[in-house]
Amino acid sequence: MSIVILNRVSKSKKNYAEWLKESKEKVYLLNHQETVETFEDTNLLRKGFNNFSTNGLVDYEVVEIHRNDPIKALIALEEGEIIRAGYLREYLNIEGQKLNSAMYFRDKYLMKTCLKKQGVRVPAFKKIDNRVDLFEFINQEGYPVLIKPLSSWSSKGIQVLNNEHDLKKCLLKNTFENYMVEKYLDAKVYHVDGLLINNKIVFCCASSYINTPLAYKKNIGFGSVLFEKGNKFADKLIEFVKSSLAKMPLTENMSFHVEVFHEEKSNELFICEMGSRTIGAGTDELIKYSFNLDLDKILTQAQAGVHLDMNIIERNISGQLFIRPQKGFLRHFPEKLPFDWCFIYEKRGILGEYYEGSSEKPTDSYAVVYFEGKTQKKLFERVEILEEYFIENTTWEN
């Protein structure tokens, strides 16, 4: 028997060789060409592919491996590979998340239709097959509305239409192929992340977004901060997510990332989106720091059938802040930070580079800061300190 891994990132981010060191099976790593060399000092059977996500030879290789060395587990942690892995598991009859489950967590229309039918609150929505569908929805629900691709991630391709001017601008260049429209809720956004092992939730935590995932469209700050243990609102979020997940086609072992709206006027919770994967953009570092838990490591070990190296240790809660670029040439920004409550500082900016501001995705940034504190209130106070510090210590030139 064998284990096959579909992977994009480097060994420093996902050390499969270390995670699966107790496995008795051969481990095949099918990897993006750009990062495959980082695994050279491991005993993984490696093969790199250009254009990994669209390269059908990856799928062909999985089938060939299975023919010669039957696959026990097909591991695909990246959101972009979930559907591919679902198809392959279905075709080859491999244990794990099959296509039906994968589709319900990737296709936003299927997801929300499933939840709505079972009484879970979701914003009003409609699949768009043509422009008239969009007109009808706006006539019924009014502005503002969200236009979003059915299977995008990281808020990619989402547009907010506030009025007819926005609608006309959108109509100029959008064919609405594989899109849906949704009523925009003026609500705070939270996320709940966790791990399901052997059909049981073994870990779950709640966090508050700093602003919303669409904040980049206004070039304002974005990030995430955990709730402290015992926070009643966090407990409410977690229970809502657990009951909502129970309505979905789950698989035996999976991580999950669920975004939740809280409408303060009605004090009601709504499901924004669900993903059968670990939260990305480095935000999983908060869980590693505050709980001594690497979700992807434990999920990989569970899928491979080896001992789970899980030892949850609760420390101070933590947060992550993306520092937005302004428009202009970046001339100076902090080399290091003077705060002992910051535990990771990623310098992404390139001095002398011209930036157009932040408009492409939520994680656009020239720096990322990870920081800790005892309460969420303290974390939000530190967000303000960090934002002010970067404004005062960064130089932009037009």
Residue ranges and their predicted role:
Residues 1-100, 132, 306-308, 325, ...:
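ATP-binding N-terminal substructure of ATP-dependent carboxylate-amine bond-forming enzymes
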Residues 106-186, 197-199, 224-246, 387:
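Active-site nucleotide/adenylate-binding loops and adjacent lid/helix of ATP-dependent enzymes
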Residues 117, 300-398:
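Peripheral (often C-terminal) accessory segments that flank ATP-dependent C-N-forming ligase machineries
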Residues 149-151, 217-219, 359-364:
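Short, flexible turn/loop "capping" segments at secondary-structure junctions
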Residues 183-189, 194-250, 262-264, 275-303, ...:
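ATP-dependent carboxylate/phosphate-activation module, predominantly the ATP-grasp catalytic core
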Residues 202, 256, 268-273:
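Protein kinase-like catalytic core scaffold
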Residues 250-257:
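Active-site-adjacent "lid" and substrate-binding segments of diverse enzymatic cores
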